[in-house]
């Protein structure tokens, strides 16, 4: 069976780790991964003719030494919209607020906005994902709500003053995630960390400050990486410099390692899973064994 469509939807991640696409294009690794499905090692055993696109995507994501770019959970986005944004309610006399998502990505926050019943403005320069986001909007969006999708970088979006009720996003990680090769991509347009921080990240935060109504919130989901060790600290400081007040930090649970302290790799080896907190930075994670957390910083105008 031809599973090329499963691979074509997997984007690349920068760094030393292999990307799912690289596993797909490597005959040795791809064969080894498929054999693990056929033999039931690490995956549910399936005969060749029963292997689905979903099985292939799962294998490519979980292959040893592989990482991929991720999508923000729509349920988590909807929860934040429910808390921070008004909805249409004749009983309470409120109307649906408007949110801006500076980096739309793969549509997790758009789906969350649709589920929460709020108006949505999103910006992102990536052409393929923009087309997919239009399909999400057209298929799942509500006719009585507004969903404005703009194919541009967030640093160039100039909102009307005090027109936004909430700004929420997970910005691209400089030197870690590559979502496309468009010249408007922030890591291409601003190709050094200092330039990216000043011209992209700070400008995006400044645009959010301009657009937000007084007392409303900006929420940014970021995390330090090996390539950008102070992403969290820099993000908070830039928001303070723009004029925001850092009023809270919420923790997003990314994954849970069930069972004991060992796991089996696709190569059939048993390895120890170290679950201790090895985070180095200012914002300490909750100390819950087996869980990985990222901060969502909450700022108030």
Model-derived segments and their meaning:
Residues 2-7, 11:
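Single conserved hydrophobic/aromatic residue that forms the stacking wall/gate
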Residues 71-94:
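Conserved alpha-helix/loop element of class I SAM-dependent methyltransferases that forms part
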Residues 77-79, 98-113, 122-124, 152-155, ...:
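Conserved proline-anchored active-site loop of SAM-dependent methyltransferases
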Residues 134-159:
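S-adenosyl-L-methionine
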Residues 164-204, 226:
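Mobile active-site "lid"/loop adjacent to the S-adenosyl-L-methionine
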Residues 194-255:
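Conserved Class I SAM-dependent methyltransferase catalytic core
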Residues 226-236, 244-301:
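Class I S-adenosyl-L-methionine
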